[in-house]
Structures are given as structure tokens and as C-alpha cells.
Amino acid sequence: MHESNTLYGGPMTKLRQAINQVLAAVLLAGIGFYRRFISPMIGPRCRFTPTCSAYGLEAIQKHGPWKGGWLTVKRLLRCHPFTPCGCDPVPD
């Protein structure tokens, strides 16, 4: 078997896709857990529109677990009392 078959369209690509799907599912489940159990206890605190959890869901669904997860982490680091409020959509 040629190396290109294992890297591009072969077993490695399928493995990478499976890992990405599992990672995305774990991240989305974490956001769902936060929304269901933690957010109701602490109340609304996000300074942005959309909220950080909505941003995370959209970013991961739109860009995948790696880039979407990184965008979400950067957003969470910006969400604090010393940051101005406002609209901060997920980039294209």
C-alpha cells in the first residue's frame, strides 16, 4: 500500500475524522452539562452576545473541535468584568 493511501483518504484520515467527531461530542457535552447544571446555579454572567456557551457550540459546530475549541477558550479568557460588553460573533 502506498503511503499516500494511508495519509490522504485512507485509514489515517478515517481515524483522524473519528477522533475529531469524538472530541467534538465531548466538548459539546461539556457545554451542555454547563448549561444544564452549572449555569442555573450561578446565573447569567456573560458580557457578550451570543453567550459564551452559545459561542462555544457554534464555534465547534462551524470550525470543528480544534479551531472551535481554541476560539472558545480565547472567548472565555476575554469574558471578565474588565472587558467591555458587546456583540462578539463566531468568525467565519
Curated annotation (Swiss-Prot):
Keywords: Cell inner membrane, Cell membrane, Membrane. It is a peripheral membrane protein. The keyword Cell membrane applies. Its main location: membrane. GO terms for cellular component: plasma membrane. It comes from the Bacteria. HAMAP family: UPF0161_YidD (MF_00386). Belongs to the UPF0161 family. This is Putative membrane protein insertion efficiency factor.
